[in-house]
């Protein structure tokens, strides 16, 4: 029997650096894990106002809150099975201009609340680039491909940040999900996601986000 209820809350504790600037973020979220819907309110508690675009942090809070993904019955849900022991993930983000982010997450559960401890490191963002100039305008919807390897779930996808004045800033995401106990492994599949910032103050020290996340088999399989 699953320990995950139809409605859950979660807490986010994130700390890290971007081009040497230290910051901390805390958040409170809620949603419906089996429907793939979630919202979160986030606050920069240290290091604000941030001298870089919020958008490089936003996926770590929701495309990071992986239990809130709607799975069909014929695809085993690797992440939900991992509880109550929980799971971890590690991520590398390679941007087209040579900037790199490494991220880790430790996800646990207590009652009807998930807790996410996130560590973030961003390096080599050009001072005149869209991240340090805060010229990004949110992520396009995307699809992550997922496959099993060595008891872990490997995710890979290309994501695109919209830019002021048009165009995109591209980034390749590689994520490794690791359950803290043996679980039934899914086959090759995809997760479609749409992440939006729905509200924020002027300097992005207070941000609200929502995400829809749905797993599926390949369309032409």
UniProtKB/Swiss-Prot annotation:
Keywords annotated in UniProt: Chromophore, Luminescence, Photoprotein
Purpose: Thought to play a role in photoprotection of the coral's resident symbiont microalgae's photosystems from photoinhibition caused by high light levels found near the surface of coral reefs.
Assigned protein family: Belongs to the GFP family.
Practical use: Fluorescent proteins have become a useful and ubiquitous tool for making chimeric proteins, where they function as a fluorescent protein tag. Typically they tolerate N- and C-terminal fusion to a broad variety of proteins. They have been expressed in most known cell types and are used as a noninvasive fluorescent marker in living cells and organisms. They enable a wide range of applications where they have functioned as a cell lineage tracer, reporter of gene expression, or as a measure of protein-protein interactions.
Entry-linked Pfam families: GFP
Modified residues ((E)-2,3-didehydrotyrosine): 63
Stated name of the protein: GFP-like non-fluorescent chromoprotein
Taxonomic lineage of the native organism: Eukaryota, Metazoa, Cnidaria, Anthozoa, Hexacorallia
UniProt cross-link 2-iminomethyl-5-imidazolinone (Gln-Gly), position: 62-64
First and last residue of the signal peptide: none
Miscellaneous note of the record: The wild-type form is non-fluorescent with the color being pH dependent, ranging from yellow at low pH, through red to blue at high pH. The His-142 mutation produces a fluorescent form.
Biological-process GO terms, alphabetical: bioluminescence
